[in-house]
Amino acid sequence: MHWAKILGVGIGAAALLGLGIILGHFAIPKATEPLASSVSDSQDLDLAILDSVMGQLDASRIRENLRELSKEPHVATSARDEALVQLLLGRWKDSASGLDTAKTYEYTVLLSFPSTEQPNSVEVVGPNGTVFHSFQPFEKNLTGEQAEPNVLQPYAAYAPPGTPKGPLVYANRGSEDDFKKLEAEGINLKGTIALTRYGSVGRGAKAINAARHGVVGVLVYTDPGDINDGKSLPNETFPNSWGLPPSGVERGSYYEYFGDPLTPYLPAHPVSFRLDPHNISGFPPIPTQPIGFEDAKNLLCNLNGTSAPDSWQGALGCEYKLGPGFEPNGNFPAGSEVKVSVYNRLELRNSSNVLGIIQGAVEPDRYVIYGNHRDSWVHGAVDPSSGTAVLLEISRVLGTLLKKGTWRPRRSIIFASWGAEEFGLIGSTEFTEEFLSKLQERTVTYINVDISVFSNATLRAQGTPPVQSVIFSATKEISAPGSSGLSIYDNWIRYTNRSSPVYGLVPSMGTLGAGSDYASFIHFLGITSMDLAYTYDRSKTSARIYPTYHTAFDTFDYVEKFLDPGFSSHQAVARTAGSVLLRLSDSLFLPLNVSDYSETLQSFLQAAQENLGALLESHNISLGPLVTAVEKFKAAAAALNQHILTLQKSSPDPLQVRMVNDQLMLLERAFLNPRAFPEERYYSHVLWAPNTASVATFPGLANAYARAQEINSGAEAWAEVERQLSIAVMALEGAAATLQPVTDL
């Protein structure tokens, strides 16, 4: 994920100087021709252009993009990954459909790879070292693609090398509570190997939690009950259905943070300070290896010990037990242990981001950024190439209009292809670190389309509250795939909805965690962000994600046969993302509704009052200032909306428009406090930092309150609750001040 430089424009220097606009540092060349014949300061969204773009977005072209992008494995920094860099550059420099400029930006980052000379292994060994069972080092070759030479062995990226051996225990999801449960059952975890399943806590957290309790090695598998609705037989899974085959193994980064591990808060350039590798935090402390559920079954169905709790049971066709060790009448002799051999190595590699830029005609120094990562663990047809295929089609259509001279956006559009996302959002994070000030000053919104199609039932949108209105407006005008005759909006509301006190029944939008490249934009820079995709009907499957996620079975044929035959859902995402992009880049007034934050804040406040209020009161901590701050924000947001409506009915001065748009753009930054969560790297957003408590309220307040409730917590813990309450109050007051008339101080 990465970005570049921007230069000036050549359309009326006086007007540009009057607005104080230069595009700056992102590689837009100086214009040698007029940008567009019809450009004016009052340029607004052209509905005819919008309709034209919607009509030109072609499902068959998206299909061909995906076929090309996913035909070979392209892990970050591989030869194929670099070939795709050149493909993107070629498309964005094309004489008929290219953009104003395209450029690469390179960072030297620390990645983790399995050894090619000594593959990782998992074995069941007897007391004398006899190997009774060896696990599959690679997934089974079911369609030919799994045996290609560049398919990486399944591994846990950033797990340390080592060859621990010990009796096996089953630790469910590998949470802290899970390990405490095992100890409460009288199981001595020191020197054991823990078998865990994906879900509940992050990959790396499983190993961190395990090591804290004396475990020396960790195995991780995907249970068919979590991904296949219980189906586990070969004839029930890929290539016969969308289900994960028994040998399928989910790869992934086990690094707990995001960005280059050696250069936190600094771009990974050769001259940047780097940590000593021994001082890196966030890596798994013990050897860890993912395995398929076929191999996990051999372990779980032979374990000794007491039965696991009902909530720990899965779908492998046997009763899960806790261990330690194997049952005496099972497949393995008494005293057999599990040996985990990990030979991963750390390497410094050069990873590229690619930026394609369309220079804005009126406000070139205001950026609407559309990003998708390029790298995958194997072929990556779904993750991420479904998103890259859509990105290339949107940029082709807009580039064609640009080259014909019939359109140029009001604001600059930046298309970004991020590198090394799978290792921890590295490309996008390095980019935001390098251009922090510029991006905070100039970026209107960040649109992320990582996986564009999980499946073909309905839209899934995540984002901060101000983007709700522009997504709703776009989806009401686009037909949903299929023959229902519904709009994407009306189809969406059938699958997932909520009751809004303002709007009534509306589609449900999710919030943004740190699962893709929007993370550094929203949490670190405070840039209004969203993520768009099509997904499955959750009433028909309990799968936590599409089943072949991060495996060698995520291929073009998998997409075409099981996820989106005809590619109409890909086209629907292209139209949705393209419409949102145009509305944000071309509308005179930014289509961001700050009042939609009022609902969120009121909900947070109500949760705090109902769940925290009584105990806070007993510690002489009042929520009164928070109530006042929420009301102040709501009033300021409503007043700004009314001011915008008034301006829209008149012929506003360009500077009036600019001032209002800056208020809309900068609102999200007002919620940043870099000192609020010192234990959370990159998390500065007071409303969207990780909430580890059970109460859906202001995360800092919720987390501090939960810690203060713990046994033996003292005055210091309650002082932190007061501090977090003050942080929330001041963030809301600062946000309200941002929305008030600019002359009010």
UniProtKB/Swiss-Prot annotation:
Topology: which residues are Extracellular? 29-745
- What glycosylation sites does the entry record? N128, N141, N235, N279, N304, N350, N456, N497, N593, N620
User: Gene3D superfamilies in the record, alphabetically?
Assistant: 3.50.30.30, Transferrin receptor-like, dimerisation domain (1.20.930.40), Zn peptidases (3.40.630.10)
Presence of the UniProt keyword Metal-binding in the record: yes
- InterPro entries with a match to the protein in the record: PA_dom_sf, PA_domain, Peptidase_M28, Peptidase_M28B, TFR-like_dimer_dom, TFR-like_dimer_dom_sf
Show the active-site residues.
E421
List the expressing tissues. Answer: Detected on apical villi on the brush border membrane of ileum enterocytes (at protein level). Mainly expressed in the distal small intestine.
Offer one example of a GO biological process linked to this entry: proteolysis
What membrane topology was assigned to this protein in its record? Single-pass type II membrane protein
Q: Where does Zn(2+) 2 bind?
A: D383, E422, H550
Q: Answer yes or no on keyword NADP.
A: no
Modification note:
N-glycosylated.
GO molecular function terms attached to this record: aminopeptidase activity; calcium ion binding; carboxypeptidase activity; metallopeptidase activity; protein homodimerization activity; zinc ion binding
Task: Tell me the protein family, please.
Answer: Belongs to the peptidase M28 family. M28B subfamily.
Q: What is this protein called?
A: Aminopeptidase NAALADL1
Organism, by scientific name, is Rattus norvegicus
Q: What is the lineage of its organism?
A: Eukaryota, Metazoa, Chordata, Craniata, Vertebrata
User: Its gene?
Assistant: Naaladl1
